[in-house]
């Protein structure tokens, strides 16, 4: 049983490598299908829009040459935006590109204030912030301070199995008390054989960095993990722009509320990916005509020569003000620091530069939503509004030029 689940309901594949196994199986199917063309090392910079909606995308190949890709249906499945933070379990490509290009094309985003921080990411100086799955605590793993003190029972009746946001804030409180930068996840309740059989991927990864988790506790600390907000979609994966669909972490249907349960992200991607496919089978989308020219919006608001410096600044700012605990003063200051400064120069076709523009846009939108929600709910915690307000049982939908509030139970229905 994983944290906050009422019963054991999560299916696993190859021990602790369920996500990897799903990716492997899907990749195998894609590669074996002669009707699917794969374009590797392309960077999608913008959507192609016009009178009838989305006609496809503008991409750049690895040489920097622009490529126009036309489609009757365009599906964004670009993942999240964890790379806006200094510490994240996300891969390098999780820079919010799908959300950003959709937003520039006028597509509304929703629930952007709800970024989930995973309580237990590997914390070793030489290692990436590798995810230590919740299932480790579900199987008996215990959180302890450097002094060996178990602390979670003092905070919550479910102890280590409390919801992610609670465990994350409790760890943060312990670190603030002690001045340490990590706590320990103690697996001594499990035998070495149980650890190797149940968590082979974690065991091998930690061993790569010189840590034998059958003998030593795992140093862990919270890290940005999952964006529950995203492109507002309906139950068929449709967005506010005709012919554009989205699924997975880039999308927001509302199924995760303010605090996603462990393993439900994989389920989300599978379910909504299939629903989009079913919709496309039943509805033969087409255009009455293809425009000779498309509307394309690229951003060019920072100096290309300062990409690395600006990126580190952005990560530091987001970590400080859009982190586990937020408050108005810091959010307002961050908003002023990120005010766009546009250049008349044509943006360079450099994917690192374009990623930075996307990340800046998403951070600004997140700040706007976080300031708007004057309460704490799920993964969104404000120290200046520390309680949940029933009047805020609402969803914040973010259009390019305005915010709208909708009842929490609202299901989007984009009728094309």
Residue ranges of predicted features:
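FAD-site-proximal beta/loop scaffold in flavoenzymes
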Residues: 46-68, 211-253
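Thiamine diphosphate
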Residues: 90-103, 109
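Flexible, glycine/charged-enriched surface loops at secondary-structure junctions
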Residues: 33-37, 41, 109, 182, ...
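Alpha-helix capping and helix-loop boundary segments enriched in small/acidic/polar residues
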Residues: 17, 66, 85-93, 127-131, ...
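Glycine- and aromatic-enriched mobile tails/lids
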Residues: 1-7, 144-156, 160, 171-174, ...
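Glycine-/small-residue-rich beta->alpha transition segments that form the dinucleotide
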Residues: 71-73, 77-82, 250
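Conserved redox-cofactor binding core of oxidoreductases
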Residues: 1-65, 70, 77, 121-124
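An anion/pyrophosphate-binding glycine-rich loop and adjacent beta-alpha core
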Residues: 101, 107-218, 269, 279-285
């Amino acid at each position: 049983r994983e944290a906050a689940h009422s019963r054991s309901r999560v299916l696993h594949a190859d021990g602790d490598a369920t996500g990897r196994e799903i990716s492997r199986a899907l990749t195998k199917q894609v590669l074996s299908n002669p009707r699917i063309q794969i374009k590797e090392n392309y960077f999608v910079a913008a959507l192609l829009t016009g009178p009838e909606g989305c006609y496809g995308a503008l991409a750049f190949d690895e040489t920097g040459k622009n490529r126009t890709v036309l489609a009757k249906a365009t599906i964004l499945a670009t993942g999240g935006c964890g790379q806006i933070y200094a510490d994240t379990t996300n891969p390098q490509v999780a820079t919010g590109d799908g959300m950003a290009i959709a937003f520039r094309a006028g597509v509304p985003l929703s629930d952007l204030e709800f970024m989930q921080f995973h309580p237990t990411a590997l914390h070793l100086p030489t290692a990436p912030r590798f995810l230590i799955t919740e299932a480790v605590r579900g199987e008996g793993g215990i959180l302890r301070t450097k002094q060996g003190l178990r602390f979670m029972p003092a905070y919550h009746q479910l102890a280590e199995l409390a919801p992610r946001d609670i465990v994350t804030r409790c760890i943060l409180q312990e670190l603030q008390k002690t001045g340490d930068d990590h706590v320990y996840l103690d697996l001594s309740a499990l035998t070495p054989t149980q650890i190797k059989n149940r968590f082979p991927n974690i065991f091998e990864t930690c061993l790569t960095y010189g840590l034998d988790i059958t003998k030593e506790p795992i140093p862990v600390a919270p890290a940005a993990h999952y964006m529950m907000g995203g492109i507002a979609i309906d139950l068929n994966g449709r967005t506010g722009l005709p012919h554009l669909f989205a699924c997975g972490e880039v999308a927001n249907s509302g199924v995760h509320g303010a605090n996603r349960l462990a393993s439900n992200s994989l389920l989300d991607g599978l379910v909504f990916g299939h629903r989009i496919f079913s919709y496309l089978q039943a509805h033969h989308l087409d255009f009455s005509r293809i425009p000779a020219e498309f509307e394309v919006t690229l951003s060019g608001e920072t100096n290309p020569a300062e990409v690395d410096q600006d990126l580190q600044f952005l990560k530091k700012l987001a970590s400080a003000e859009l982190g586990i605990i937020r408050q108005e003063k810091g959010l307002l200051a961050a908003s002023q620091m990120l005010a766009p400064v546009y250049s008349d120069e044509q943006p360079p076709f450099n994917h690192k530069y374009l990623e930075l523009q996307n990340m800046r846009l998403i951070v600004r939108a997140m700040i706007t939503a976080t300031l708007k929600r004057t309460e704490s709910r799920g993964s969104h915690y404000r120290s200046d509004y520390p309680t949940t307000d029933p009047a805020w049982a609402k969803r914040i939908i973010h259009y390019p030029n305005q915010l709208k509030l909708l009842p929490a139970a609202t299901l989007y229905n984009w009728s094309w």
